[in-house]
Amino acid sequence: MTKMIKKTTWFALALLLTASCRRQDEAAADSHVVRCAVIGGMTMTGLWQQIGKMFEADTGYHIEVVATGPRPVLDAAMRAGKVDLLTMHSGDITTDLVADGYGINMRPWTRNELCIVGPPDDPAHIRGMTNGAAALRKIAAAKAHFVDFEGIGSRELVHTLWRLAGAEPKGDWVLRDDTVSKFNILQFARTNDAYVVVGYIPAQSGLMPATGMEILVQGDPIMRRPFIVMETNPQKISGVNSAGAKALSDYLLSPKVQSFLLEFGRWPKGPGPIFFPIPAAQP
């Protein structure tokens, strides 16, 4: 009986895998379907779903989100030939996709914003500031605890802010990030009564639990990170819907979507906006 159950289970799994592969093959062959890999923040907030509805209504294409989540997941999906288009934060991963021949026509199309989160008693008195560098300068002057977060995007931007602040994050007031998961960084900061720079979306949405912490500084254009869009290279991957990917990529940079970003960009739990247009966006 046990052997029969195992055989039945494996047979069922094989059928599921076969069906899944068949659906992917059919999608790849369907010129009306655009398979996408989308960074998690866009699907979590509903931005991508709204843009998808607009695109489908205006063009007749159908968007299929094949992969969503952190950047490594999207990177793997493009390299495996599962998607026609990818959108995520710019960085080494996206540059490597282009350098390795998987991605083409990489263009920025929107930005999100980072913020400074800290304890409610705000020992450095930065609450309400809209200049990140000036806020860090005050944190350094007060020698208030500050977490050197290891998050890829945050770390790059914070280095820029410290340079603009004309201060160095050195001393026992600078705490090393030793969290196992980046989503625990606000809890770590709370435990140490410290400030930290993180993305506004995960902080405001609860993706990074922030009990006992407050968003104190936001609204600085310098604290914004670009998202790029790129199409899969048909010379590297077969079965790519290049026409559909190009149409969607151009659509993201269209005046209609760029205007919509600010209309959409109000987080239900906070003042927003969440996403920002690219001033020079042109298809």
Predicted regions: what they are:
Residues T2-W10:
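Bacterial N-terminal signal peptides that target proteins for export
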Residues L85-R111:
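Acidic, polar ligand-binding/catalytic clefts
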